Amino acid sequence: MTTVPISNIRNFSIVAHIDHGKSTLADRLIQTTGGLQAREMKEQVLDSMDIERERGITIKAQTVRLNYHAQDGRDYIFNLMDTPGHVDFAYEVSRSLAACEGSLLVVDASQGVEAQTLANVYHALDAGHEIVPVLNKVDLPAAEPEQVRQQIEDVIGIDASEAVMISAKTGLGIDLVLEAIVHRLPPPQGDREAPLKALLVDSWYDVYLGVVVLVRVVDGVMKKGQRIRMMGTNAAYDLERVGFFTPKMTQVDELGPGEIGFITAGIKEVADTRVGDTITDDKKPVTEMLPGFKPAVPVVFCGLFPVDADDFETLRAAMGKLRLNDASFSFEMETSAALGFGFRCGFLGLLHLEIIQERLSREFDLNLIATAPSVIYKMHLTDGTELEIHNPIDMPDVVKIAEIQEPWIEATILTPDEYLGSVLKLCQDRRGTQKELTYVGSRAMVKYNLPLNEVVFDFYDRLKSVSKGYASFDYHLTDYQPADLVKMQILVNAEPVDALSMLVHRTRAEGRGRAMVEKMKELIPPHMFVIPIQAAIGGKIIARETVRALRKDVTAKCYGGDITRKRKLLEKQKEGKKKMRQFGKVDIPQEAFIAALKVDS
């Protein structure tokens, strides 16, 4: 393969809100430049996971290399990175952007700028990208390209007068996009003669090849057989394969500066390849590392337990496998009296949690129960020490706590005008404080400060339902603030059920507790004795429901005769019930757990 001069390489990514057509545009670019034959084309070529295709979202960032013969007669190489649009996977976005010099900003001409569009554009601007706006779906009857163009200028503040008008589905205007990439995006900078310096963009596990590493070469050349060193982990490997994706894996002899491709080097664990690390030559290393990116910090925690206790080892193996491909997912073992053995897992957000849960049940055929999601709280103790806890069970004695702090976020919500009232009410109910409210055409953009604790439960679902699905939402963590939080426990027959204990705000405890005990009452079947179900804060019971006992008619065999005979039998039954209540064990069905955890706050 002839080497293309570095000035003819373009590295770019596609950023957009969920569902604005990034992956479809990527399909068209691949098709137009001949990356795949027509029979190999399927919709969303780059969304390789089943879940991605089903939900129509992109989870893992994907990359592909295209050859393009431009109108000026030159041959260009495009490296396209398709990135996720959802807020939980912003981490995947930031690392794709670090490997590129430019971005195509795709905006749906019928929907306009959404919250995620903003977040991702700011990521791209932070990475120093040149941005080309692209208006997609202009063939829809509801499309308003002129208004959306104005909106891009007003909200994001970039010049959209030369925005490219396309319809990715029908292929309209794709050639204009390709020319815009050539003329409006900058080529990468790099020195072929300098020592090797490459950025580790991503890594995943392949059953045959071991760990496959996605790299962006900055300076120097990567060749087969070369010995490389990872500067962060200080491990050295011999390169076995070097190549790129067209989206199929294609091997080459070397990757030069500005190119994006993959390498394999007999690496066993994905954990050995830190995303954002710098790769260099073992013999001629560079002295300073490339600026990496911040490692992803889990924000939401929850316990995952197998419904069938025998599945525990399968679950452990499955989690290990997912961890191979998803560096932002973390877990540790935990045991619960009610649910047995399981894992405490950390996620980037609720969608991430849902996806992992779904992948576990799908790819590994596991039945799981998830406990209530919680966030990291900081406890300042009276003896001056500070604790971080994400499991309510670990909470120290109340007497020892001087102050509890909880994480807050800044949420940006874009919503059509007519739903603004209900959106504001929802945020108000969740202890939010409004920061600003601006109008962009007929849409309102609200910024709210909210406690993360209130958001992880079901905020996103509620937001979608009060706005009929039109509002979009994006958030980032700001800081920790003191909060009046209490630990609420659910007692069944005077025994605390550890899987249901949670930290709630004092003002919300009673409502939450009442809802949970009512739900439990419906779902716990009657036993031979009375079962009280209580919600308690410390020693104070805040809500109670009772499951009535089943009773056998012991006086059925008495015909007439003396009343004392009946009384004797009834007293005897009463004694037995009392004893039973003391020693009897209550079986809580799995549905009761699941329902209690789903109780709407």
From Swiss-Prot:
Membrane topology summary: Peripheral membrane protein
Compartment annotation: Cell inner membrane
One GO CC annotation: plasma membrane
Record keywords, A-Z: Cell inner membrane, Cell membrane, GTP-binding, Hydrolase, Membrane, Nucleotide-binding, Protein biosynthesis
Chief subcellular location: membrane
SMART domains noted in UniProt: EFG_C
UniProt binding sites for GTP: 19-24, 136-139
Gene3D superfamilies per UniProt: 3.30.70.240, Elongation factor 4, C-terminal domain, Elongation Factor G (Translational Gtpase), domain 3, P-loop containing nucleotide triphosphate hydrolases, Translation factors
Keyword Plastid: no
Residue span, tr-type G domain: 7-189
EC number(s) per entry: 3.6.5.n1
Reaction(s) catalysed by this chain's protein: GTP + H2O = GDP + phosphate + H(+)
GO biological process: positive regulation of translation
InterPro entries the record matches: EF-4 (IPR006297), EFG_III/V (IPR035647), EFG_V-like (IPR000640), EFTu-like_2 (IPR004161), G_TR_CS (IPR031157), LepA_C_sf (IPR038363), LepA_CTD (IPR013842), LepA_IV (IPR035654)
UniProt-recorded Gene Ontology molecular function terms: GTP binding; GTPase activity; guanosine tetraphosphate binding; ribosome binding; translation elongation factor activity
Reported function: Required for accurate and efficient protein synthesis under certain stress conditions. May act as a fidelity factor of the translation reaction, by catalyzing a one-codon backward translocation of tRNAs on improperly translocated ribosomes. Back-translocation proceeds from a post-translocation (POST) complex to a pre-translocation (PRE) complex, thus giving elongation factor G a second chance to translocate the tRNAs correctly. Binds to ribosomes in a GTP-dependent manner.
UniProt similarity note: Belongs to the TRAFAC class translation factor GTPase superfamily. Classic translation factor GTPase family. LepA subfamily.
Name listed for the protein in its UniProt record: Elongation factor 4
Organism: Rhodopseudomonas palustris (strain BisB18)
